[in-house]
């Protein structure tokens, strides 16, 4: 999987950037996504997280991770519903699945609050957001159990334990 990473803060260590790419590629394999799958991750501060949270969720506070799922039917591209694309073309298309915005301030706060490493927290936030982009949620106890169980399974298998 290709992950475009942007550090708007200029403060994220290169090891965290590489780990984020690796853990997301690992999670993509776990979900059997195509190797050509693409997404982006932007590291932001709390002020930018607050702006984005207000813009996309109408919530007036910063948050740890914002997940924006790409929905082809809401894109600028137009495909006629009756149009059939050749199978070869469909296989070649690189599916962009969405973007994450991770607050570095919240990551540091939460790592301290939960008593685990900053590496674990960045991994947790990346995988959590990734699962949201791929249709997982935690509105009900059943959904929460499924999503958090899969999230923990991915992080543990990758090596980011508590």
Swiss-Prot record:
Record has rRNA processing as a keyword: yes
Top-level taxon: Bacteria
Residues reported in the UniProt entry to bind Zn(2+): 128, 132, 138
Listed GO CC annotations: cytoplasm
Molecular function, one GO term: metalloendopeptidase activity
EC number: 3.1.-.-
Cofactor annotation: Zn(2+)
Cofactor note as given: Binds 1 zinc ion.
Keywords annotated in UniProt: Cytoplasm, Endonuclease, Hydrolase, Metal-binding, Nuclease, Ribosome biogenesis, rRNA processing, Zinc
GO biological process assignments: rRNA processing
Subcellular localization, as worded in the UniProt entry: Cytoplasm
Cysteines engaged in disulfide bonds, as pairs: none
Top EC group: hydrolase
Keyword Aminoacyl-tRNA synthetase among record annotations: no
Signal peptide: none
The protein's role, per its UniProt record: Single strand-specific metallo-endoribonuclease involved in late-stage 70S ribosome quality control and in maturation of the 3' terminus of the 16S rRNA.
PANTHER family the record matches: ENDORIBONUCLEASE YBEY, CHLOROPLASTIC (PTHR46986:SF1)
Family: Belongs to the endoribonuclease YbeY family.
Name of the protein described by the UniProt record: Endoribonuclease YbeY
Organism field: Lactococcus lactis subsp. lactis (strain IL1403) (Streptococcus lactis)
Gene for this chain: ybeY
């Amino acid at each position: 999987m290709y992950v475009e990473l942007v550090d708007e803060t200029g403060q994220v260590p290169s090891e965290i950037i590489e780990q984020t790419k690796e853990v997301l590629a690992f999670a993509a394999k776990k979900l059997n996504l195509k190797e050509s799958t693409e997404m982006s991750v932007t590291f932001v501060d709390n002020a930018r997280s607050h702006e984005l949270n207000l813009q996309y969720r109408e919530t007036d506070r910063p948050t740890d991770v914002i997940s924006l799922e790409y929905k082809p039917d809401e894109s600028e591209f137009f495909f006629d519903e009756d149009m059939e694309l050749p199978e070869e073309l469909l296989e070649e298309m690189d599916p962009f699945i969405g973007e994450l915005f991770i607050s570095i301030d919240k990551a540091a706060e939460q790592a301290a609050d939960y008593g685990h490493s900053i590496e674990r927290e960045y991994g947790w936030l990346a995988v959590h957001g990734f699962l949201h982009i791929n249709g997982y949620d935690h509105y009900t106890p059943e959904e929460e159990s499924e999503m958090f169980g899969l999230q923990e399974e991915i992080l543990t298998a990758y090596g980011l334990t508590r």
